[in-house]
Design a protein with these regions (language model features):
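Conserved catalytic-core segment of NTP-binding enzymes
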Residues: 1-102
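C-terminal boundary of histidine-terminating zinc-finger modules
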Residues: 107-129
Length: 140
């Protein structure tokens, strides 16, 4: 831990034992929220789980921020999800929004991260902006 500025543990979207273990060892969490209807239901369950982990296993755990993913500006649903979360969640919300992007969807099937699969894609550029935002926040 002393040798790195950041250690990222990318967990599956399900609240599994792996996710609980990651929360137990982490200092903070970045919560990705898909701009989809069911993501809002999952968010309340995730917040509840984080609170339980804070109470029982890791009192220092904090939510670093929330990032919107799979955002599609052409849909009212994406706009509504963003508005709903901003109105109801008292957390840091990153300015960077990760758009729905075909290259992002393709990259895992080629076993590559987006910054190697298509570094000039909108998705790759968005994740680079998010990384810069996270790093900058960590320096504050």
């Amino acid at each position: 831990k002393d040798e790195y500025d950041f250690i990222v543990i990318d967990c599956p979207p399900a609240l599994s034992m792996l996710t609980i273990n990651a929360m137990t060892t982490a200092d903070s969490i970045i919560v990705p929220i898909q701009c989809e209807y069911y993501a809002l239901e999952g968010l309340s369950q995730l917040i509840h789980t984080i609170e339980l982990v804070q109470e029982r296993l890791n009192p220092k755990l904090e939510i670093e921020g929330v990032v919107f993913t799979m955002y599609d500006a052409r849909t009212n649903l994406s706009l509504q999800v963003v508005e709903n979360v901003k109105d109801n969640l008292n957390q840091n919300i990153y300015k960077t929004i990760i758009p729905r992007n075909i290259r992002l969807a393709e990259a895992p099937s080629y076993g590559m991260p987006i910054n190697l699969y298509d570094p000039k894609s909108t998705g790759a550029e968005s994740y680079m902006l998010l990384a810069e935002e996270v790093i900058h926040k960590g320096e504050e």
